[in-house]
Amino acid sequence: MTKQKLLLNGTFSLILIVACEAQQLPRSHAASSSGPLCEKEAESWGNLLSSERLDAWICSLIGSFMVGLSGIFPLLVIPFETGAALRSEAGSRRLKQLLSFAIGGLLGNVFLHLLPEAWAYTCSAAAGEGQSFQQQKLLGLWVIIGFLTFLALEKIFLEKEEEECPGVGCDYKAPLGKIPNGSGYPPSKVAGKSQRAEKNSTQCNGSSLQSCRTDNRIKISGYLNLLANTIDNFTHGLAVAASFLVSRKVGFLTTMAILLHEIPHEVGDFAILLRAGFDRWSAAKMQLSTALGGIVGACFAICAQSPKGAGETVAWILPFTSGGFLYIALVNVVPDLLEEKNPWNSLQQILLLCTGITVMVLLAHN
């Protein structure tokens, strides 16, 4: 899984490098073609490092880092067990309740925050009605591209996981793949599978059962969620920096609004990481690492030297991220909830899902 994590991080870094190079290419070409343009380029760099810009740099980086720190907030509010406790009846029920809230938060984040913001930009940037309609169709296309990208990534890495431990002689693999229902696994079935697993522990492709269990301990859905969060934090960094470019007051208000929106969202993301196999501290550290996306986004917005330049980037990143969040919520998390057989637990999960959406509605109106 380390190679997979490095590949995901490398992919995102490559996207950022290409985006930065694409923005700097026209400037460098103009600078090499004539002397006056070269002087304008030097003047623009001087403006970038002026005292006003320096204030925007400092405030934007601090604001983006504060937004990233919200990733460790779930440690303060979720006294959640890990390891074997997740496979118990009570632990499974609590995890599914958190996952229900996470689905509501993700759906509310997509349809009440990300897509409306991208829609508002396309409407304001369009010159005519025909152009506005074309940009709105492009917005929907980016949502589909984001969904399919996350589908392709999971298919690629899922095949590699199955090759590492195909399960020949590993009877214990079946119960490891899913969270038990609210009623728990029947004790006799679990005991029987455990005995067969011990008997065949040395027959899993020449390696022990413990090594197979370790290889599949972290699900790819956890890394996909981290990738989506990194891109989401990149857009937050763009918004924070663009606001500080307008004024310090607007920047502080924007930072506070994003923080209020991120807290319930991070709680849901934390539950998804626990479901993927991370322990509490590893999940918090991985959530904190996504703050780098916000810092990169803030630097990108300030180097664009205008809120409009940041807005053009947001116009396609927001719907792309929305597609990724939709994939995580509907494909990776919802199937676990559909396995619930207890009617009372199912009702609780639906109520918590609605609670997550309600929280996002309240934050969207503030």
Curated annotation (Swiss-Prot):
GO molecular function (one): zinc ion transmembrane transporter activity
Keywords annotated in UniProt: Cytoplasmic vesicle, Endoplasmic reticulum, Golgi apparatus, Ion transport, Membrane, Transmembrane, Transmembrane helix, Transport, Zinc, Zinc transport
Pfam families (alphabetical): Zip
Gene Ontology CC: cytoplasmic vesicle membrane; endoplasmic reticulum membrane; Golgi membrane
Subcellular location: Golgi apparatus membrane; Cytoplasmic vesicle membrane; Endoplasmic reticulum membrane
Motif range (XEXPHE-motif): 261-266
GO BP annotations listed: intracellular zinc ion homeostasis; zinc ion transmembrane transport; zinc ion transport
Record has Membrane as a keyword: yes
Transmembrane segments: 6-26, 58-78, 98-118, 138-158, 226-246, 283-303, 314-334, 344-364
Chain intervals for the UniProt region annotation (Disordered): 183-205
Side Lumenal, residues: 1-5, 79-97, 159-225, 304-313, 365-366
Disulfide links within the chain: none
Family per record: Belongs to the ZIP transporter (TC 2.A.5) family.
Record PANTHER family: ZINC TRANSPORTER SLC39A7 HISTIDINE-RICH MEMBRANE PROTEIN KE4, ZINC TRANSPORTER ZIP13
Function field: Functions as a zinc transporter transporting Zn(2+) from the Golgi apparatus to the cytosol and thus influences the zinc level at least in areas of the cytosol.
Protein name (Swiss-Prot/TrEMBL): Zinc transporter ZIP13
Gene: SLC39A13
